[in-house]
Amino acid sequence: METIHNISNRLQEVLATNKSVNVDTDNDSLSSNQEDNEVEKVRHLVVILGEKYSYAVDRNTGINALMQWFTTNSEIPEEILNAIRSKLNFTYRTNFEPIERAPDGPSPINPLIMLRINPIDAIENVFNNRECFFTDVGWGCMIRTGQSLLGNALQRVKSTVKDQPYIYEMDDTKEITDLFKDNTKSAFSLQNFVKCGRIYNKIAPGEWFGPATTATCIRYLIQENPCYGIEACYISVSSGDIFKENIQGMIDRYPNGNILILLGIKLGLDSVHERYWGEIKTMLESPFSVGIAGGRPSSSLYFFGYFDDTLLFFDPHNSQTALIDDFDESCHTENFGKLNFSDLDPSMLLGFLLPCSKWDEFQEFTSLLTIVNVLDGMDQYRDPDLNSNDIGNVELSPQLKLSQTPDAITDDDYVDIGALIQGNSMNINDRDNGYQEVQCKNQQIVIMDSLNETKPLEIEKVLVGQGTNLVNATTPCREAFPK
């Protein structure tokens, strides 16, 4: 009779060849039943931005085989691989159109950054212009994941307008990716994100963007440039609260349009509580989802789907050169990363694309969630310590342009609003760089008119008992994709 040790060895040999087996200890033998009996299959769900794919594997060897290809990205079913390849992925770039250093900002000559790029490029940049940034390596990851979220939202609009599935040939995405090329002429370029961040949030070139700043820049850039099918943008960085009156106002204005909804949330202190895992899956399964940006401390990723308890993401930290002819092709990849829900950072930016005609469906979808809430009004959620006389008209002026410099009193992603509560002036010299150190907070943004001007005043992240909430603004834009 074979020993248990021998049987174990033979089992491992058979499993290595991915065969289904029976152990027959009575007859002292191991026999394959692959030809004689139907092998029992187990189906696993793979979700990619609202699209669901079922993958069948043998019960006995399936987990090993499935985890192997999710570990090595090898032997992935072609249908799933095509779905991943079709999504847009924006990464660090080098040798792009120079961005001038701010007098009060960091220096482009950073040894840590220089070590992470091509040595020839580093030397060339030093000799050509020491006062300009030629790469966003080390500081641009949140901008890049914001671009990925926005780019895939635009791709969703295009596929819907043309009545096509979400997955199509990469040639169809060129008119979208051209909007993200690294030059000032491209509507959603890194250069324009940096310009917007400098004007409205006092973020200098070379400084890291937070989720709130990224969301704010996306909204302003949608306003400033032709929207290519996205007519309005609603953002909140205080919570996942969406107010009906704001959305309904946008729908009344653009009944056949699309609204990009960006929600900054924090689902825990150091990690995402397990009770939220299912809701994150539900959101990614929704046809409204355009992904999640963030999810790692000071190292943003773009999450586009999941498998079991593993999130799938694109990593923006893989740098590419900006001066290439096949730019569109470089925005697609088969390489993706995996992250367990237990390792996910709780601060993240959720993205949803809402066709105005599907507002009722979206509300029904959010009724399944506790993370995202559609609420009737916002008066009861205003901080009682904030006198209503201090808050002007919360409707943003549609004439606002990037060329203007409003009295934005934000710095980085957090500011102290104590001075605003007690008077009409604030000291913006005291910088709050404690984004990662804050363990308990109610992240906050308020956009309003100043007391004497029509320019917007933006305040982010306050530690309050009950948060005031974001208000939204939109301007008309032409339809870019013909029906």
UniProtKB/Swiss-Prot annotation:
GO annotations under biological process? aggrephagy; autophagosome assembly; cytoplasm to vacuole targeting by the Cvt pathway; mitophagy; piecemeal microautophagy of the nucleus; protein processing; protein targeting to membrane
List the transmembrane segments.
Answer: none
Which UniProt key words apply to this protein? Autophagy, Cytoplasm, Hydrolase, Nucleus, Protease, Protein transport, Thiol protease, Transport
EC class name: hydrolase
> Which Gene Ontology cellular component annotation is one that this UniProt entry carries?
mitochondrion
The reply on keyword Transcription is no
Top-level taxon: Eukaryota
The places in or outside the cell where this protein is found are:
Cytoplasm; Nucleus; Preautophagosomal structure
Is Hydrolase set as a keyword in this record? yes
UniProt-recorded Gene Ontology molecular function terms? cysteine-type endopeptidase activity; protein-phosphatidylethanolamide deconjugating activity
| Active site per database record | 141, 315, 317
According to UniProt, the reaction catalysed is: [protein]-C-terminal L-amino acid-glycyl-phosphatidylethanolamide + H2O = [protein]-C-terminal L-amino acid-glycine + a 1,2-diacyl-sn-glycero-3-phosphoethanolamine
State one Pfam family annotation: Peptidase_C54
Q: Taking the first listed entry, what is the main subcellular location of this protein, grouped into a coarse class?
A: cytoplasm
What does the record give as EC number? Answer: 3.4.22.-
Known InterPro entries for this protein? Papain-like_cys_pep_sf, Peptidase_C54, Peptidase_C54_cat
Q: What does this protein do?
A: Cysteine protease that plays a key role in cytoplasm to vacuole transport (Cvt) and autophagy by mediating both proteolytic activation and delipidation of ATG8. Required for selective autophagic degradation of the nucleus (nucleophagy) as well as for mitophagy which contributes to regulate mitochondrial quantity and quality by eliminating the mitochondria to a basal level to fulfill cellular energy requirements and preventing excess ROS production. The protease activity is required for proteolytic activation of ATG8: cleaves the C-terminal amino acid of ATG8 to reveal a C-terminal glycine.
User: What does the sequence similarity comment in the record state about its family?
Assistant: Belongs to the peptidase C54 family.
Its name, as the record gives it, is Probable cysteine protease ATG4
Q: Which organism is it from?
A: Candida glabrata (strain ATCC 2001 / BCRC 20586 / JCM 3761 / NBRC 0622 / NRRL Y-65 / CBS 138)
Q: What is the lineage of its organism?
A: Eukaryota, Fungi, Dikarya, Ascomycota, Saccharomycotina
Q: Source gene?
A: ATG4
